[in-house]
A protein has these predicted regions:
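C-terminal segment of classical bacterial N-terminal signal peptides
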Residues: 14-25
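Bacterial N-terminal signal peptides that target proteins for export
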Residues: 1-13
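Small-residue-enriched, tightly packed secondary-structure blocks
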Residues: 27-185
């Protein structure tokens, strides 16, 4: 019986790993498609969220992942690729990867944008060889209610994150434990 459970868990982990790794093509040196997706995602976010527009005016940089795929059945994972924008120009490419286990089932796509409000937070990203969210600079997740109260005087430091464009069915979306790593196209 224990052997059967172990085999089932291994099969589920392989299924999740395969789905996460192959649902989106890797960047593989061609960044044009990713650049277009980033531009489109930022325009959509700014059209829907006045708070994101306010933050973008004061932010030192914006790290945006236009499409992150999350799948899971007891064991889960997520993967997405994005770009770091400074002064309206792409200065680097990153991926986000996370794994999880527990009571979960489903598949979902979403995007997220992180607004770096101070130099220290941006330097932490640039100097780390893989940054795990939840370790390092503080991150504030902005929802509609909070977004209405954002002013330039309240957003001087740290990182503000927006999760948007959720499609699919999976209980909850979180970034805790996600690891962000710089890509070398």
């Amino acid at each position: 019986m224990r052997t059967m459970i172990r085999l089932l868990l291994v099969a589920m982990m392989l299924t999740v790993f395969t789905a996460v790794c192959f649902t989106q093509p890797a960047m593989a040196g061609d960044t044009t498609k990713l650049d277009r997706a980033v531009d489109k995602a930022l325009k959509k976010l700014y059209a829907k969220s006045p708070a994101a527009v306010k933050l973008s005016r004061e932010a030192k940089a914006v790290l945006i992942f236009p499409s992150v795929t999350k799948v899971g059945f007891l064991v889960g994972g997520q993967y997405g690729e994005g770009a770091l924008i400074v002064d309206g120009k792409t200065v680097g490419y990153y991926n986000t990867v996370a794994g999880s286990y527990g009571l979960q089932a489903g598949a979902q796509k979403f995007g997220y944008a992180m607004f770096f409000m101070d130099t220290a937070s941006l330097e932490y990203l640039n100097n780390s060889s893989g940054w795990e969210i939840g370790v390092g600079p503080s991150i504030v997740f902005v929802d509609e209610g909070m977004g209405k109260n954002i002013t330039t005087s309240t957003t001087k430091e740290g990182i503000y994150a927006f999760i948007y464009g959720q499609k699919g069915l999976m209980a909850g979306v979180g970034l805790q434990g996600s690891k962000i790593t710089k890509l070398n196209p």
